[in-house]
Amino acid sequence: MEDIMTSLLVATSRVVVTISLAYVPVKSAFAAPQNAAGLCSAIAASSIPASRISLPTTGAKIQSATLIGGSDPANQNGEYCKVIGQIKPVDPKAPDIIWQVNLPSVWNGKMLQYGGGGYNGSIPPTTDKTTLGLDVVPTPLTQGYVTFGSDSGHQAPNADDASFAKNDEAMLNYGYMHIKKVLDVAKVLVTERYEKPVTRVYFQGGSTGGREGLTAASRWPESYDGILTNYPTANFVGLRLWGAGLARAVYDDKSAGWIPPKLVERISKEALKSCDGLDGVEDGLVGNMQQCRAQSAVLVQSLACKSDVTGNPDDCLTQAQIERTLKIYHEGYSLPYQLANGINTYPGYNSLEGIMMQLGSEPQMRTPPVSGPNAHHSSRSFEFLQNFVQRDQPLNLLSFDIREPGKLKDRIVELSDVIGATRTDWSTFSDRGGKIIWLQGNDDPSVSPLGNAKLFESIVAKMGADKVKGFMRFFLVPGLAHGGGRFSPTWDNLAALDNWVEHDVPPSNPVVVDATKSSTKGRSRPLCEYPSWPKYKGDGDVAIASSFSCADD
């Protein structure tokens, strides 16, 4: 497998050299002054040669270009040309990259790329608001941004399907290549449509889309000016290994580690009851997470079975559940080898601090595992190990040892660089004025908040706190899960990023509004720069951000 991947990467570098030497500016097929409808129609009849895409392809084709009228009752984004097309692969067996570019008739000179989710497989909603953006703020497209995104180079019925990764080109596209290929295509369309230069390029997304944003800025720092990244799967391979380790902890030895849903819910409620007031107010949110984690051992002891119980009781925790499942869920794991950028740990989750562990409704693991009935991470970890790592050989998830993966170790380490955003030196991006706003939820059950906090700390250790503060802001948000949660922070994040890039005005404890569909909808809190957290001042309306200050004690 490594030889195949290396061959493709070598071929990639050769094609890039050939493209750069052979590049000849292509005369526009649709640049003549026309009205918006005429320009959009001209795009439909065009194509983009491989020479205008900086990574290996066989060119891009336009599938359709449709002018969406500003008076269309189904359109709230103003008049724009909706362009859909394909980037054709080098390998004829690889899937196309399906993309969408939205060209507003009134353009502000800026572009916004949208990231995907899970294993992708479909185009993200490029006409919608940003991830965690305010509903009352006009969409980026309405504001005049060219918005665009892609399926990352394969088509799938859902974001859990990773079968595409058995093809090297499709796997590399998913890992990082689709990001730049689609940007290049979008820039060609922008140049030809408007005949004036792009002033700014931004990227926004959450989860996989958050990882893609960090990847974009770290791999092509000269191409991006600002990134909005939310709960990114930055250590993608580390997360997938954690899911495999969790599966063994839960389902090995006749599922001795499986915790029934009733007990999972009780753990969450007891933790919240114990920790809710540590930030000065009982509001359903745990702000002082550090102190809460310090109390976790007491919580476990209070829920432990009083006698040597076996099986999976729903009223107390057995030793197997404590020593296996809770240990890896709460503390994570360490490896005797290093992934990309020297990482050999994956910290756990706030599983004893109020989040709902996702351990599935069934005590036995299905073959293959399925999210919902089985632990959430087990299914995506199986998909990763089967399709990215093992590929053609059947995989037994419960026999896979993340610490001793044998002959698969080199492949795992290699993939951690291909599909990951854990680099710690951002000097090139920061030196040219690039900015990053990064949100991570403390209640996230899918991406470890401790892991992303540790990555941020590594960036600070590498570059120095003052330099990092000049281009990156990292906010840990109480109550935010993997999107949604007990507190869903929404704000005009694109305006905050643009203001920082354009005017060098960084976001300073910005106010976010809870969009959770519950009785608490509309309450506000300050975003606090890590490691600080929102602490109630002791008086004032608990639903208003001004009643809180950012504390780190």
Swiss-Prot record:
Q: Signal peptide location in the record?
A: 1-31
Taxonomy, superkingdom: Bacteria
Per UniProt, which keywords does this protein have?
Calcium, Disulfide bond, Hydrolase, Metal-binding, Plasmid, Serine esterase, Signal
Q: Name one GO molecular function term.
A: carboxylic ester hydrolase activity
Its EC number is 3.1.1.-
SUPFAM superfamilies in the record? alpha/beta-Hydrolases (SSF53474)
Which cysteine-cysteine pairs are annotated as disulfide bonds in the entry? 275-292, 528-550
Identify the Pfam families for this entry: Tannase (PF07519)
Q: Does the keyword Cell inner membrane apply?
A: no
Task: List the active-site residues.
Answer: 207, 444, 482
The UniProt entry, under InterPro entries, shows: AB_hydrolase_fold, Tannase/feruloyl_esterase
The positions annotated for binding Ca(2+) are 276, 279, 281, 283, 285
Q: Report the sequence similarity comment from the record.
A: Belongs to the tannase family.
Do you know which PANTHER family this protein is assigned to? Answer: FERULOYL ESTERASE B-RELATED
Please report the name of this protein according to its UniProt entry: Uncharacterized esterase Atu5261
Native source organism of the sequence: Agrobacterium fabrum (strain C58 / ATCC 33970)
Q: What is the lineage of its organism?
A: Bacteria, Pseudomonadati, Pseudomonadota, Alphaproteobacteria, Hyphomicrobiales
